[in-house]
Amino acid sequence: MPIERTKVVARTGRGGLSLIEEALPPLGPHDVLIDVHRSLVSPGTELGGGWAALRRERDDPKPLEMPRPIGYSNAGVVRSVGADVSKVSVGQRVAAVGAGYARHAVEAVVPENLVIPLPDAVTFEAGSFAMLAATALHAVRRTRVSLGEYSAVLGLGLVGQLTAALLRLSGTYVIGWDLLATRCRTAERMGIDATCAVSDADPVEATERFTGGAGLDNAVVAIAGEATSA
């Protein structure tokens, strides 16, 4: 029997979150219906800027625009596919991305071009990181790093941690900056070369010591804010 409704996490117009039930969109010829096993909370979007938005909504509710489903990265098993889908099949493990599609939901309808097969060795939990991992990978590619260079990652949230790990795998020496010492310690456990908790130390001096005075070859800004808005 076809599934017609699902449950999804949504922002409400009162500055909060709620689990709501809504109709699933019809399955188009290029769509994939996924039974979601894991979805990833993006701290910068949903807990950073997201909480600011929640406060605005609490102070100025807009009932006609709420509730608003959230989430953009999940993983699960394909339940059904549209007539023209060729990349994945029913029963296959997949990861999905895309705001408005790969939501925090029980089921999700996602366009085929936003769905990728998951290797057997990759867990659903790891697969749900696909969107943020792709963001980090794009940042590393844009730096055009070379072996032996010095890199800095400014901000050690999820994207920053993933970026630092990928830079290390690319053969660079990496220092990470963050306001929170706990994030620096996490990066150190992940194998980063050096960190600086900028609330306790001067990051410029720390970076000069790290590079032996040579300076940085590249840097990735992995923090939310107007300076990083495209």
Regions found by a protein language model. Give the residues of each.
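Residue-level marker of beta-strand positions
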Residues: 38, 73, 92-93, 107, ...
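Mid-domain Rossmann-like dinucleotide-binding core that forms the NAD(H)/NADP(H) cofactor-binding site
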Residues: 125-200, 205
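Glycine-rich beta-strand-centered segment in the early N-terminal region that forms part
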Residues: 25-41, 49, 53-100
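Short, compositionally biased
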Residues: 106-120, 171-172
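Glycine-rich cofactor phosphate-binding loops and adjacent beta1-alpha1 units
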Residues: 193-230
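Conserved hydrophobic beta-strands of the Rossmann-like cofactor-binding core
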Residues: 94, 150-153, 219-220
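Glycine/Thr-rich phosphate-binding loops of Rossmann-like dinucleotide-binding domains
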Residues: 104, 161-162, 228-230
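A structural motif shared across PLP-dependent enzymes of the aminotransferase-like
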Residues: 43, 98-112
